[in-house]
A protein has these predicted regions:
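A short, Lys/Arg-rich alpha-helix, primarily the initiator
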Residues: 1-23
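Helix-turn-helix/winged-helix DNA-binding modules
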Residues: 12, 23, 49-52, 63
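Short basic helix-loop element that most often maps to the first helix and adjoining turn
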Residues: 15-34, 59
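Conserved hydrophobic/aromatic packing and binding residues within compact polymer-binding modules
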Residues: 17, 31-32, 42-45, 71
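Recognition helix of helix-turn-helix/homeodomain-like DNA-binding domains
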Residues: 36-52
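DNA major-groove recognition helix of helix-turn-helix/homeodomain DNA-binding modules
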Residues: 55-70
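Short amphipathic recognition helices of helix-turn-helix/homeodomain-type DNA-binding modules
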Residues: 70-80
Length: 80
């Protein structure tokens, strides 16, 4: 089984994060400030070079104004 970072589902996850960030009207810098990280952290996530744990994903979702269950439901919808 390939590493999860190389799976197609990860690409969908990354696209969803980017889409929610843009819908929230946030730049990578603004999002990174909200989560207490540097801009390169968000850039690496969106380029698929950085894995996220569940807590980091939750923090990102909250910073974008979406709760984690809603985000996961949108992810599942895109994956189906």
């Amino acid at each position: 089984m390939p590493k999860t970072i190389h799976r197609p589902e990860t690409r969908v996850l990354i696209e969803l994060i980017r889409d929610f960030r843009r819908e929230a009207g946030l730049t990578q810098v603004e999002l990174s400030t909200r989560i207490g990280r540097v801009q390169s952290f968000v850039s690496n996530v969106e380029q698929g070079q950085r894995r996220l744990d569940l807590i980091q994903l939750r923090d990102i979702c909250r910073a974008m104004g979406v709760d984690l269950p809603t985000f996961v439901a949108c992810l599942e919808e895109r994956l189906d």
